[in-house]
Amino acid sequence: MPTLSGAIWSSIGGWTAEMPSRAADGNTSSGLAMTAFVADVQAALASLEPAAAKNTEVQRTVRQRVGQQAFRQAMLDYWQGSCAVTGLALPQALKASHAKAWALCTEDAERLDVFNGFLLSANLDALFDCYLASFADDGALLIAPTVPPAAREQLGLTGDLRLRWVAAQHRLYLAFHRAQCAWLNE
């Protein structure tokens, strides 16, 4: 069974082997050559579709965040094993959320800084992670106006919700997070 990389390599190999004959035909412009290459790759990919449709799993190379588990444990310790807002003490339903996203941190110290995170229930984490929720410097929960009242109620986000405490060191990261929330900056 051909693999994706093998099929592409075969296509490239066949295409590059034909380059002298294509040059002899006068087909040397980069646009025509690229068009031919793209057609060859598309044909190779099309030949893989039946095999790919029969498989329900793929093997991938993954770039994993080293330190994510340590960060989660630090969040569990700092927030005493419960949600920073609701107090929910069910670790399986809690997420270690970064105020300044892992990918946006410029150094490892920021990624692992306990003040760059909040232990949040899964529903709060989902909103916080996609910038539909944030927190004011005093810890008050801020929710985007695009989250309808009915959804807020269904998510249990009613009343005066706030972080159980806010350290001065949290405020820099909270300001960064709020700056990413387009609805707060309109």
Question: Predicted regions span which residues?
Answer:
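Residue-level detector of alpha-helix boundaries and kinks
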Residues: 29, 33, 59-60, 106, ...
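Short, charged surface segments at domain edges that flank catalytic/cofactor-binding sites
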Residues: 44-85, 102-114
